[in-house]
Amino acid sequence: NKLNDELLMETYQHKDVELLFASAKDNDKLQTEQIEKFIQRGVDLLIISPNQVHSITPVIDKAYDKGIPVILFDRKTDSQKYTAFIGADNVKVGKTIGEFIAKTLHGEGKVIEIKGLDNSSPAIDRHKGFVQALSRYPDIQLKRTLSGEWTKESGYKSIKSAIVDAKDCNIVWGQNDRMAEGAQRAMAEAGIRNVLYVGTDALPSKGGGRSCAQRQAACIVYLSHSW
């Protein structure tokens, strides 16, 4: 994880700083429990990437109310109880993708979107920006907005479940590269050709990210270094 690596590099320079990690693996309950344990331990600072907007908010509010500085990274909650937010403008990401697709289709065509985890702030904001961009092009039809979970398998399953609608679409946009690649595999298995696939992130991760982006028509790069 790039963030973890950079945090480690910085803390190596400060012998009196202890850095603790916890991975919730996209599990709301586990993330809540982990944050509770850090609160009980009396940590001096929390850096959190909330799995989903609503379910993690109460425990983050609790930490903030106890006077613990909270930095939200990449994802937000539905509360203003945090010290700082570090992340990209995901509404702008969605708008950029929407404009690219509109220009690629010359203002006319059919599109399918695969969202990330429904209640995660990047999925919400990217969809918002995407819809805003497409609203300027009345001849572009957003046929379906499918639910994924940021994984290649969820992209595959979501398209499989909507294969009838997918048959005559022109472009599939996955809100990240892995979902776009999963969709591409599902369409290929169904014998559907001549569809363009657009992804997002191009992060340097094993088995995805940049390697997925190379197999797509386009990908918007989601910056992750030195925010």
Protein language model annotation of sequence segments:
Residues N1-W227:
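A residue-level marker of the well-folded mature domains of exported/periplasmic proteins
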